[in-house]
Amino acid sequence: RGENVRPTVSIYCPSLEQRNSGSASTVCLVDKFYPGGAQVTWKGDNKVISSGVDTSDKIKDKDNTYSMSSTLTMSSEEFKYSTMTCEVTHPTLTPALAKSFQTSECTF
C-alpha cells in the first residue's frame, strides 16, 4: 500500500451494568490507518492517565490498513472525571485526533 490513510477513532462509555459492578472500562477503537505507527493516549479532564491501560497490537486488515483498540479500566470510584478523552497520534494527523465524551452522558 503506498498512500497514507487517516484513522477513524471511536470512543465508548463504560456500561452502566459494569459501573454498578464496581469497575469502568472505556474503549477507544482506531480503525483503517496506514502506515502502522498509531499511538493512543488517555486523558481524564486533560490529565494523562497511564495506569489501567491495555492497548492491543495492531491488526492488519484485508485492504492492508491497520486497526487497533485501547481499553482504559478503573474502579467506579476512580471514574470521576467529567471528560474522558482518547487521543490518537499518527503520521497523517497534525495535530493529534482526540475523541471525548462527558461522563455525565454515560447513562446507558
Curated annotation (Swiss-Prot):
<dbReference type="InterPro" id="IPR003597">
    <property type="entry name" value="Ig_C1-set"/>
</dbReference>
<keyword id="KW-1015">Disulfide bond</keyword>
<keyword id="KW-0393">Immunoglobulin domain</keyword>
<dbReference type="InterPro" id="IPR013783">
    <property type="entry name" value="Ig-like_fold"/>
</dbReference>
<dbReference type="Pfam" id="PF07654">
    <property type="entry name" value="C1-set"/>
</dbReference>
<dbReference type="InterPro" id="IPR050160">
    <property type="entry name" value="MHC/Immunoglobulin"/>
</dbReference>
<dbReference type="InterPro" id="IPR007110">
    <property type="entry name" value="Ig-like_dom"/>
</dbReference>
<dbReference type="InterPro" id="IPR036179">
    <property type="entry name" value="Ig-like_dom_sf"/>
</dbReference>
<feature type="disulfide bond">
    <location>
        <begin position="13"/>
        <end position="106"/>
    </location>
</feature>
<feature type="domain" description="Ig-like">
    <location>
        <begin position="7"/>
        <end position="102"/>
    </location>
</feature>
<feature type="disulfide bond">
    <location>
        <begin position="28"/>
        <end position="86"/>
    </location>
</feature>
<protein>
    <recommendedName>
        <fullName>Ig light chain C region</fullName>
    </recommendedName>
</protein>
